[in-house]
Amino acid sequence: MRSLATLHQSPASCSRSAPVAPCPARRANSSRRVARQGPRARASSPVVETESEDVDITPQIDAFEELVRLAVEKDPSLATLAEQHLRSKSKSAAPVSPFAAPSPGSPSASSMLGPSLGALPNQNKPAWLRQRAPQGEIYSGLKDQLRGLKLATVCEEAQCPNIGECWNGELATATIMLLGDTCTRGCRFCAVNTARTPPPPDPNEPVNTATAVASWGVGYVVLTSVDRDDMPDGGSEHFAATVRTLKQLRPGILVECLTPDFKGDLDAVRHLARSGLDVYAHNVETVERLQKRVRDPRAGYMQTLDVLRAAKECGVYTKSSIMLGLGETDDEVIDTMLDLKAVGVDIFTLGQYLQPTPHHLPVTEFVTPEKFEYWRKFGQEEIGFRYVASGPMVRSSYKAGEFFLHSMIESDRAKARAAQEGAAGRVRPL
């Protein structure tokens, strides 16, 4: 299944070559390149200057707290709800030292990636990636409820490292995985089960999913699915039926659908995009050069862009995500951002790839929190995405990100309603 929520246990980052200088426009002779909208922005990667080899380790940046802070900064009325989210997190979060002590013989500081990580890739993870095993009464209760309704979650199937955070606290939520727990594809980064002919989907799944989600009392939910190349429409109608049922039970809930590519069937994409969902998410996963190495051969970079373009044409918010740590370069990350922006993507997330098992792709390197913060600012300020979430533990479906998107969407709709009411007030009857 194609999802950053399916990032597993392996390290990642950008290239360790020399700092990136402003780049020229992408290869002009690339005949299949997406048409650009506006000039191609470029910026140098941040350079960390050190006076000696004994450099301080970059402090951990808490992605959850940062995203909540940004939401309150944009809309101060969210302050009370923000406190509730942060209390929720503090009850379940494992204490992790904000500084990682370098080990003897660790690599020297990199001008691109900041200070030494203290460990080579595929050895001990840096401190900012260490988390306590999920536990707690709320966690266990949610797990039992999902089992009782025979619902699969990407949180478990993809071994998401944030499960202890999202399944705990006052606003516990999970990302439901539709169409079963077995994928017809075999991406080399993903831990979800695979089979050529999975069991048929449960016909009661749309109702069971909507019932469970409606009972949680959350205002924003993410639905995702495995790839089902064995189904004529790739599962688009099953997905759409779940959205329609959920909207009937909870009309005010905002629904994000993190989808497969439906084999490139754009009619299936449009069918789901028009089902009543609010955010259409489909992940590019990695840069163009690494697609064949990382994703199943039936997926593709240009196919992903076509899916996102078709969804955007239906008038919904669109979102995509990329994993770092697979051997990509800074130039390639920038090119990917530009391609996504060119097809209208509103929301972009970046997270650390974590290798789920020894049989999956190895991690090339761990990316520092400092570098992730650079990409967040670059994506919003230089590329122009509406919203960027970037951090080692950030995943496409992430509770803190949902909080920010909820506030952004509600704010947009409130402004649209006010504009309509203002226009109606200016119309005088004859």
Curated annotation (Swiss-Prot):
GO cellular component terms, A-Z: chloroplast
Keyword Iron-sulfur part of the UniProt annotation: yes
CDD domains assigned: Radical_SAM
Organelle transit peptide: 1-40
Pathway this chain belongs to: Protein modification; protein lipoylation via endogenous pathway; protein N(6)-(lipoyl)lysine from octanoyl-[acyl-carrier-protein]: step 2/2
UniProt cofactor(s): [4Fe-4S] cluster
Cofactor remark from the record: Binds 2 [4Fe-4S] clusters per subunit. One cluster is coordinated with 3 cysteines and an exchangeable S-adenosyl-L-methionine.
Region (Disordered): 1-55, 85-119
Subcellular location: Plastid, Chloroplast
Protein name (Swiss-Prot/TrEMBL): Lipoyl synthase, chloroplastic
InterPro entries: Aldolase_TIM (IPR013785), Elp3/MiaA/NifB-like_rSAM (IPR006638), LIAS_N (IPR031691), Lipoyl_synth (IPR003698), Lipoyl_synth_chlpt (IPR027526), rSAM (IPR007197)
Enzyme Commission code: 2.8.1.8
Source organism, top-level taxon: Eukaryota
PROSITE patterns referenced in this protein's UniProt entry, alphabetically: RADICAL_SAM
Biased composition range(s): Polar residues: 1-16
Record: residues binding [4Fe-4S] cluster 1: C155, C160, C166, S397
Start and end residues of each Radical SAM core domain: 166-386
GO molecular function: 4 iron, 4 sulfur cluster binding; lipoate synthase activity; metal ion binding
Catalyzed reactions: [[Fe-S] cluster scaffold protein carrying a second [4Fe-4S](2+) cluster] + N(6)-octanoyl-L-lysyl-[protein] + 2 oxidized [2Fe-2S]-[ferredoxin] + 2 S-adenosyl-L-methionine + 4 H(+) = [[Fe-S] cluster scaffold protein] + N(6)-[(R)-dihydrolipoyl]-L-lysyl-[protein] + 4 Fe(3+) + 2 hydrogen sulfide + 2 5'-deoxyadenosine + 2 L-methionine + 2 reduced [2Fe-2S]-[ferredoxin]
Broad enzyme group: transferase
Ligand binding ([4Fe-4S] cluster 2): C183, C187, C190
Pfam families: LIAS_N (PF16881), Radical_SAM (PF04055)
Taxonomic source organism: Chlamydomonas reinhardtii (Chlamydomonas smithii)
Low complexity bias spans: 91-119
